[in-house]
């Protein structure tokens, strides 16, 4: 149960780490999961506040042949979704809304010749996942972000609370996730696939990139 406590501390730390309107981003790390019960004992996540964004830890290499289970926790407010690698004994939290959207897309297309039983099962699963997403409309927004905004993995309001300035900057200010050095995920050789993004330094619009010069294309019209 120790990993559950550590996981909870990492998650809960973001709620009290920063106050006011400062943009906050933090990483949701994987958990040790030797068996299914370890995943089921992880507490449900709360939907992030308006000024908080979540970024999910991605393994450096994903061997999909080793994914032994996909868990969509229906009772959680954000439909917490885990990918379980039993060989590595780890469970990875993924963006539930992106994952479910892709899953629904897969279910809507028949890969193999469908029979009556397969079609009925696939339709039932499609309906359940679609209803699960529909009941969580307040947990995620599909509004587009403004031009130049680099949105994080999960921002409830999709406000541009953090971004990389597309122009070269003289100074940078990085944010380190509030994770203790003795966290169970720190024992991994590559805990993060990418570096934490740089917080916004200004609200200036990004520079325009001129189109690449190339050869002109000539279109010939055929006359009948």
Swiss-Prot record:
PROSITE patterns: GL_AHV (PS52024)
Superkingdom assignment: Viruses
GO cellular component: host cell Golgi apparatus; host cell plasma membrane; membrane; viral envelope; virion membrane
Protein source organism: Human herpesvirus 2 (strain HG52)
Residue span, gL alphaherpesvirus-type domain: 23-201
Disulphide bridges, residue numbers: 44-76, 149-160
Subcellular location: Virion membrane; Host cell membrane; Host Golgi apparatus, Host trans-Golgi network
Gene it is expressed from: gL
Protein name, per record: Envelope glycoprotein L
Quaternary structure (record): Interacts with glycoprotein H (gH); this interaction is necessary for the correct processing and cell surface expression of gH. The heterodimer gH/gL seems to interact with gB trimers during fusion.
